[in-house]
Amino acid sequence: MIEITQVNASLDEADDENACLIVGKRVAKRVLRCKDSEIKSIELHRKSIDARKKRDVHFILSFRVELTSPHLEREAVDSVAERDRSRVRAIEDDEPSFPSPASDAPQERPVVVGAGCAGLFAALTLAEAGLKPLLIERGDPAFRRSQAIDLFLKERILDPESNIQFGLGGAGTFSDGKLNTGTKNTRPSPYPRNLRRGGRAPRYSMGCQAAQLAPTSFPRLSPLYPSASSSSEVSSVIERSSSTFASTRLAPSPVLMSNRPKTPLASQSRQSTSSSPAGILLAIFFELLKDHNVALAQKTFAMGVRIEHPQCDIDRAQYGASAGHPALGAAPYKLVAHLPNGRSVFSFCMCPGGQVVAASSEPCHLCVNGASLNARDGRNANAALLVNVTPEDLPNDDPLAGIELQRACEAAAYRLGGSNWNAPAQLVGDFLAGRASKTPGKVKPTYPLGVTWTAIDEALPQHIVESLRLGLPLLGKKLRGYDRPDAVLTGVETRSSSPVTVTRDRACHAVSTPGLYPCGEGAGYAGGIMSAATDGIRCAEALIADL
């Protein structure tokens, strides 16, 4: 396999994947000095937008080329001209591999608690190794989750056990599925490849600079998510070797107090079950862990608001005269401002052409998130606008103090919205002036249950409010119009990251409880679906190595 990088292409000649492949084949023949018949396959590996010069917005592409024989590939790489050597290299196929099935797998079945990205890929890895894991998830399968969410949006009736946060697939099922990651772990992730393998992910999305899957895609991803037609024990990608229990909640049990979990694992479900686990991979349930003396620690997390602008304004600010070109689509952004008070304000989970979503999971507690559909053609752009909360900002050293702060902010947001699931909202101009908003401007909020115009100060800690007021004008200097007076702030965004770490060692063991393997975003070891999937695999491999 040969990789060719730094291929410049105009917007018109690379407007879709087929056009990109035509460019790639032309470049491959020239750079590798090969014939059409010698190219066995070519794949668009990366596609990013270079908008540093607004008068010359173009794509930068990279390709992976397979010739008809390894000998030809070696000759082709050796023959590359000096001017092209820096962007051509021979590579090994980075298809990630799962552990080989164990011939002497123990009778005890490992238990994976939580079926988000970490839990799903932990279970998949264990199943590939022949260990027949039990996968437990408090919420419903994706189809029933969709029904519960529809009921919430239509009737304002929240199901605390099945909602945007809880259910098979995790919170990412009904938010943006961003297929990029900032993690320093260079290990190839199987996540996008498995999505493609299932035939349900848009092929073009895999190599894009800001690749994502829309929430409408997630419930249909058959290789990852269990069937919508089953009952409490549902079929899944690992149906041949594991069991998945949806609508099942972990209950107190001696399992978490033993030196090695061998006692029955209790659960609360429509149909009860128990297990003598070989090990437990756990994604959250902090109160249960604290009650059983599992070591927890506070960690830095972030809270703030969702900010909305007209997408056309973001397009013009990012792409200049090229804004609106069909090859570009809706423009994303990523911003940060470092403040005189030593803190930072930053955007997170930006959703081009998206909407603000109702992400609440607890009665009388309101929080928001964002999502884009595949077309990214909504009128508004939105992103979380966040400020960090450090352990020093918390009132005490209780490991769950951050969770209590989150809950207090969500309860305040619910009250400010009118205690009817309306979200509190404020215009940027009013927020900067310190006055409550009364009516919208030209930017119409997209939160689906409606907003109540107010002042959002009461729903956030004072240091976050002050930092947002300092940061918005600075961000307006970085992206024209970002601090426009009628941009909409909707509160509150509290769930961007976990405020708690379930402390583990380098081998992924919970330091206080052998046989327990904390993993994923909820346990404090990931920051998105890609890093969570990778961490789930890592912890599963650690469990396998310990058997």
Residue ranges of each PLM-predicted region?
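Residues forming the flavin
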Residues: 1-59, 65-174, 178-547
